[in-house]
Each structure stands twice: as structure tokens, then as C-alpha cells.
């Protein structure tokens, strides 16, 4: 029996991989043993949903980065020579006016343009970085393959480092469309890299120095079930579940969370604009962070949908049922109003008309404006 380690340190991997047919097909093979590596805080809920006779969920301690690991991560973040990182530096300067930090990060970013510097950094990071808490698991299970589902997550990087030392082949994945240009310099190049699209493959080659021969484009696995209309909840049943009338048009509105836009009351402006339209508005609140409406009283044609919420992307969990509800919400909508988020892709999969929020309600600096996010590389054609 072959053993595969699958990382699940980033919360949405449950949606992206574990709930897909790709994972199901692996789990159904009697000649494979799948070991899901997850943080202590989420291991229990993953066991409840995905454990099976040949699928084991192992809890792994994931302490906050410190010491040399923290230094390596900060350096990797600033070495990434992308347009998104330049936007992030400008936005930070607008917020804190720390010119020393801005100039230092600009210098490091300039050095990151040179391939030699990037390769030297990776060599030093591999030599100086830690291996995390998984060494005993390698001894216990002796894996034949590591599938690192987020090659930019610190714990995935540590595991790839450990796998290389143990001679275990590693397949890595770029988890989302913005990761290559917005996270860090790719610290470990796996034996194979899987990506969603040709554009991400090109970015991985340009910014991550990944040889084209080891990159495979696989699409976005969880959209297979989005497009399967047999899995969609019937219209009348769905509308009843969210207290809406199935005879009327539906607008899905997903406001930005306070992780990205603080103290700017965008949702009330949008909802007041929609107050008199001949349609219902389903307001899907963020799954990470909050969208604080204060004492605002929404119009009678608006209904709020509050999915399970988490403080960050490490702790968030989108169960199969919750993901199905999200897909149903988009499928049954006639228009999607959102902002610079992955909801753009989710709505496009269903070929829905999309309106993006591109304004600030109050006058604010670039570093606090919603407009900065539309300057990110992955948002530009």
C-alpha cells in the first residue's frame, strides 16, 4: 500500500481539494493510504467530514513563526518582485508613513529581480529553516508522496523541506489565482507543480523560477461540482431556505470584510441604492472577517445570509454543505455584486452578470482605499 501525505493547513483546502472528485477517487482506491495533515484546531472537524478506512487525519502543531523562520518569511515576502508587492508597499506607506521600512523593502524587492539572488536565498532558506513538527509522522507512516496543497504556506514549505531531506517526492499546488504574485517568493520548488491556469503557470515560471516542464495545468477541481446542475438545490426549495420568494429576481451581494476595508460603510450605500429595484437582495456576509453595519436598518427587500465565520484563512472551514449553499446562491441569482475577491471567479463559472464595487464612501488614503486591490496583478488583464 502506498501512502500519500496531503496538507490541509490553509482552511479552504477542504473546499479546493478534499471535497472534490479528485480526492474521492484517491480515497476509493484500496491500494492507497491518505494522511491529511491539519492544524490541531481543525483536525476534529476534518475527521468528522473526511475520515474513512484508508483516510486518516493527523493533528499537527503549527506554532507561530519565530526566530530564523520569521526572518526568512519576511525576506521572502519582500524579495517577490511583483506588481502586487509594489502596490502593497505603497499602501503600507500610505498607512504608516514608515519611509525607512518602505525604502528597505523596495531595495530588497529590487534584488529579487535577479535570478541569482532568488536561487541564493532559496539555498540559504533551505539550510537555515526548520522542518516543523512532522518529522515523527514521516517515521511512523513512511510516505511515498507529499501533496503540498499550498506551496506558499509556511507549514507546507517546512514539509516540502523535510520531504526533500527524506527523499520523498513532493507535488505542490498553487492554491489560488493571486498566490504567485501576492504572497512570498516561492521558497521551495517541488518535484511537480500543479496550477489552475496557463497564466498562473507563466507567473510561477517568471516569479518562482519553476521549470515549465514540471508544471501541469489542471483547472479548478471544485468547480466540477458547481457546474453539475444535478447537485443544485431546486429553486423553490433554495428560496424558501433563505426566506425569499422564488417568483422574483435575485441579486446576490457579497460585501468586503473588515480585513480589507476598515471603517468604510459600503454595504449601506449599495443596499440603499437597491432599495427600490424590482428584485430581492441576498446579502452573503464574509466567511473571514466581519462586515460591520452598525445600527443600519436594511431595506425590506434585503435578506442576510451569515455563513460560519472565522478570524483568518487558516481557521476557516467550508463544509460540503456550506459550499453547496454558496454554489446554489450564485446559481439562482440573476446578478452578482461583489468586489475584488474570488467571488468574481465563482460568479463567472455560472456565467452571471457581475458588478464590482470600485468606490470609497469616505475620503481616504490609497492605503485604506478599496481601489488598491484592483491594482493587484491578478485583477488586471
Which residues does each PLM region occupy?
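Donor nucleotide-activated moiety binding/catalytic core segment of transferases
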Residues: 133, 138, 288-345, 349
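A short alpha->beta transition loop at the rim of the catalytic pocket in nucleotide-sugar-dependent
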Residues: 167, 334, 351-353
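Conserved N-terminal ligand/cofactor-binding loop architecture of enzyme catalytic domains
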Residues: 7, 35-135, 140
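Short N-terminal targeting/anchoring amphipathic segment
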Residues: 5, 91, 135-154, 333-340
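Nucleotide-activated donor-dependent transferases that construct or modify glycoconjugates
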Residues: 1-16, 39-40, 60-63, 252-255
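Conserved catalytic-core segment of nucleotide-activated headgroup transferases in glycan assembly
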Residues: 18-25, 223-314
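Active-site-proximal region of nucleotide-activated glycan assembly enzymes
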Residues: 121-125, 129-130, 149, 161-235
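Catalytic binding pocket for nucleotide-activated donors in carbohydrate/polymer assembly enzymes
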Residues: 187-190, 210-212, 342-381
Amino acid at each position: 500500500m502506498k501512502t500519500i501525505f496531503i496538507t490541509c493547513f490553509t482552511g479552504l483546502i477542504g473546499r479546493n481539494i478534499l471535497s472534490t472528485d479528485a480526492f474521492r477517487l484517491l480515497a476509493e482506491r484500496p491500494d492507497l493510504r491518505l494522511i491529511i495533515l491539519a492544524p490541531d484546531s481543525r483536525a476534529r472537524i476534518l475527521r468528522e467530514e473526511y475520515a474513512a478506512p484508508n483516510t486518516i487525519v493527523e493533528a499537527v502543531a503549527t506554532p507561530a513563526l519565530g526566530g530564523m523562520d520569521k526572518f526568512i518569511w519576511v525576506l521572502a515576502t519582500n524579495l517577490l518582485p511583483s506588481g502586487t508587492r509594489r502596490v502593497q508597499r505603497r499602501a503600507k506607506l500610505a498607512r504608516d508613513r514608515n519611509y525607512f521600512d518602505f525604502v528597505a523593502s523596495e531595495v530588497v524587492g529590487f534584488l529579487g529581480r535577479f535570478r541569482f539572488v532568488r536561487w541564493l536565498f532559496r539555498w540559504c532558506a533551505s539550510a537555515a529553516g526548520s522542518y516543523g513538527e512532522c518529522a515523527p509522522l514521516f517515521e511512523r507512516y513512511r510516505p511515498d508522496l507529499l501533496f503540498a496543497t499550498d506551496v506558499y504556506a509556511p507549514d507546507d514549505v517546512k514539509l516540502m523541506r523535510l520531504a526533500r531531506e527524506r527523499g520523498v517526492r513532493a507535488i505542490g499546488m498553487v492554491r489560488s489565482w493571486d498566490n504567485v504574485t501576492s504572497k512570498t517568493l516561492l521558497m521551495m520548488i517541488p518535484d511537480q507543480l500543479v496550477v489552475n491556469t496557463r497564466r498562473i503557470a507563466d507567473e510561477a515560471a517568471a516569479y518562482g523560477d519553476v521549470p515549465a516542464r514540471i508544471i501541469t495545468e489542471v483547472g479548478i477541481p471544485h468547480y466540477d461540482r458547481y457546474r453539475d446542475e444535478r447537485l443544485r438545490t431546486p429553486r423553490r426549495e433554495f428560496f424558501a431556505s433563505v426566506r425569499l420568494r422564488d417568483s422574483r429576481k435575485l441579486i446576490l451581494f457579497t460585501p468586503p470584510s473588515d480585513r480589507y476595508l476598515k471603517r468604510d460603510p459600503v454595504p449601506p450605500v449599495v443596499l440603499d441604492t437597491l432599495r427600490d429595484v424590482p428584485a430581492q437582495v441576498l446579502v452573503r456576509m464574509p466567511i473571514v472577517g466581519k462586515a460591520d453595519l452598525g445600527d443600519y436598518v436594511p431595506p425590506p427587500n434585503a435578506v442576510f445570509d451569515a455563513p460560519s465565520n472565522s478570524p483568518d484563512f487558516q481557521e476557516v472551514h467550508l463544509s460540503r454543505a456550506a459550499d453547496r449553499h454558496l454554489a446554489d446562491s450564485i446559481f439562482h441569482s440573476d446578478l452578482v455584486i461583489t468586489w475584488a475577491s474570488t467571488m468574481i471567479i465563482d460568479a463567472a463559472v455560472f456565467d452571471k452578470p457581475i458588478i464590482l464595487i470600485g468606490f470609497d464612501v469616505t475620503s481616504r488614503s490609497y492605503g485604506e482605499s478599496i481601489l488598491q486591490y484592483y491594482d493587484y496583478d491578478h485583477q488586471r488583464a
